[in-house]
Amino acid sequence: MTSRLSDPNSSARSDMSVPLYPTASPVSVEAYYSESEDEAANDFLVRMGRQQSVLRRRRRRTRCVGMVIACLLVAVLSGGFGALLMWLLR
């Protein structure tokens, strides 16, 4: 269902349509729940909680690895600049 702008003198184009209802976003296969399945609502919520925990742990692990790499990079660059400075001042 769409509504059309009826005022031909408006600054907007007259053939522009505006949806009355937002389009449905695609449902993730992992988050799909149906009453016809053998899974109870409580089991579904437990499964979703576990999936969210896994995603949270993965993000935390990725952030930690990134921080370690950044610290190592800063240490190597600092050591390189220190060695260059000592070589130039020798």
UniProtKB/Swiss-Prot annotation:
What the protein does?
Answer: Essential for the anterograde spread of the infection throughout the host nervous system. Together with the gE/gI heterodimer, US9 is involved in the sorting and transport of viral structural components toward axon tips.
Q: Subcellular localization, per the record?
A: Virion membrane; Host Golgi apparatus membrane; Host smooth endoplasmic reticulum membrane; Host cell membrane
Enumerate the InterPro entries for this protein. Answer: Herpes_US9 (IPR009278)
Report one GO cellular component. host cell plasma membrane
- Sorted alphabetically, which Pfam families does this protein's record hold? Herpes_US9
Q: Which GO terms describe its biological process?
A: intracellular transport of virus
Q: Does the keyword Ribonucleoprotein apply?
A: no
Signal sequence span per UniProt? none
Name it: Envelope protein US9
Q: Where is this region: Acidic?
A: 30-39
Q: From which lineage does this chain's organism come?
A: Viruses, Duplodnaviria, Heunggongvirae, Peploviricota, Herviviricetes
Which stretches of this protein does UniProt put in the Intravirion compartment?
Answer: 1-67
Recite the UniProt keywords alphabetically: Host cell membrane, Host endoplasmic reticulum, Host Golgi apparatus, Host membrane, Membrane, Phosphoprotein, Signal-anchor, Transmembrane, Transmembrane helix, Viral envelope protein, Virion
